[in-house]
Amino acid sequence: MNASPAHAVRLLLLGIPFAAHAQPAPTAEAGAGQLPAITVSTPRGQVAPFNVPGSVDRVDGNEMREGRLQVNLSESLGAVPGLQVQNRLNYAQDLQLSIRGFGARSTFGVRGVRLYVDGIPATLPDGQGQTSNIDIGSVDRVEVLRGPFSALYGNSSGGVLQAFTASGEGAPRLSYSAAGGSFGTWRQSLQLSGSQGAVDYLLGASRFHTDGWREHSAARRDIANGKLGIALDNGDKLTLVLNSVRIDAQDPLGLTADQYALAPRKAPLATQYDTRKTVEQTQIGLLYERRIDATQGLRFMVYGGERKTTQYQSIPPSAQQNPLHAGGVIDLSRQYGGVDVRWTAALQLADRPLDVVAGLAYDSLRERRRGFENYLGSVANPLLGVQGRLRRSERNEVWNLDPYAQGTWRLADRWTLEAGVRRSSVHFASNDRYIVGANRDDSGTARYSKTLPVASLRYQATPDLALYGSVGRGFETPTLNELSYRSGGASGLNFALRPSVNDSVELGAKARLAGGLLTAALFQTRTRDEIVTDTNVGGRATFQNAGRTRRNGFELGWQHETANHWRTQLAYTWLDATYRDAFCSPSPCAAANTVAGGNRIPGIARQSLFASLGWVPPEGWRAGVEMRALGRIQANDVNTASAPGYAVAALYAGYLKKWERWEFNAFARVDNLFDRRYVGSVIVNEGNARYYEPAQGRNWTVGFSGAYRF
């Protein structure tokens, strides 16, 4: 996959207008042979994706569950251009998720991308997020926003991913589903939903377990999810959401190139240190929506939660003899919460419609961070994988207060102007409580602020063709984890680290063709003060600011469903992400550690392709085939190690039967159909060259579900 897409881009942009003119305009009665009418969530309300002046995709929850295990977002988001989701097969570290290259540096969790679940941020104020609490079994839809307008969501919003829980409808419905597959993998889910008068409800619970394809990669995850909606007499709406997740996962770690070549399923270091992670999280959110009058509305959201994490790492006892070392066991306890108040109004400007949004968001995080040695006994004869002496104790706090506003003005019959601004201010404070000997008081504070403007212009060329251009500025602060360690073995937080600032421009086209939707976008993002790895030794990574980076890209998407229920999907991404300035990692500079200008940013594939064909009637037999290809991915900044590109295929078939009040569904699926051996993801800049996380070989999944409507 090395061909330049430039010629294809020119043909596409020249051909879309002619193709759109050749198709009859869709009518409200059209129905069969067209994609169903859908909307996506924006600050100003629900809008059809075709009318959004930016790159946004929606994946329906039923589609995410169709013929799949229903555990990871990587199973079902392949049809979203610009989104790279890699399953590490390591449930101690979450998925590797990036949007247009933002988030690619993350070695665990999600950074650089803003995540929301039912409107509640799954990204904390410092920019660190996770997807493990998303219950695919109860998801109504997932929406992915890319491009300049994602900056309106504040810090670390190189892209935005939102998941929404379904609302209960009709008479009570009780459902059970189960799926099992290779390597001791299984999932069970139970759900109750419905509505009665002004109240709708959904309660769900699921348990997932796997023995793991690799050695020392077993995991268990329990999720409970609830949603309660109450329509008040005055037309207002109150929604309560609850979510809880617990994860117990072994950490198989990465492999060196030699280890991957000889024994990709082994995890020798992980078994020696018994590396593992335990996570417990519970959160609650309350949303109040009020219609003030015919033109104005008010939305008030408040949420709170707690997350506890304990992680055992593979840091040698010898490295922990430095009196400033924080140990090999991480013990985190976090309390978080926030408020978002938003006012919307439908006004007039020069006798033209003007939609206005103004709001204020406040988010806070309080963290107790402790570090312990991961051994007992002597350095020469240690008992590994147990909690030892305390080596770190601190209380950290992060909070942000962000006012924002957005306006959409229909300035002419075919022209729409949209603009917005957000003032994002993020405050960090650390109170050191481990002051022992040479380990001095490292308390401190930092404050990062930036004004983030965005603007777009949309032209409705025909009823079936829309063109747009957008520009915007975003920024990304370092996370608490990136601030946690300083180079040279010094203790305390790295408050010298600065936020990165990016400027983005995008040109796009959307065309409705033969009942399908074709989207195309060209974009460029220039970033200064990119946050990159400085050192990665002794089990600890430190970070620094590099110079400038540039991301040039092209995305193409196609969604179509015929009248006889054949569904096709295509997503292609070309992304050239490079460092524009040279820097050294680690510092000081030497020939071996100089990152040259022009080097590719690691963790990002230059090209990716997803294609699927499925027969999906509303009842009876259904089947499909999927193909996914990914180009070579660099594993480090100096570009001396990489994971080769690959292409894999999957087949699935199932049967859906509806009988009176019952509904039954069964399926079988084979992934990696041709048993391709490849690297599923890389651990960017891993200090011991253990970059590679192998993907599993050919594997199968079978599942069954049954539901009864009372």
Where are the predicted features?
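Conserved C-terminal beta-signal and adjacent last beta-strands/turns
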Residues: 231, 243, 469, 505, ...
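Surface-exposed extracellular loop regions of Gram-negative outer-membrane beta-barrel proteins
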Residues: 248-262, 366-373, 425-436, 445, ...
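Transmembrane beta-barrel wall of Gram-negative outer-membrane proteins
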Residues: 173, 180-209, 214-252, 276-297, ...
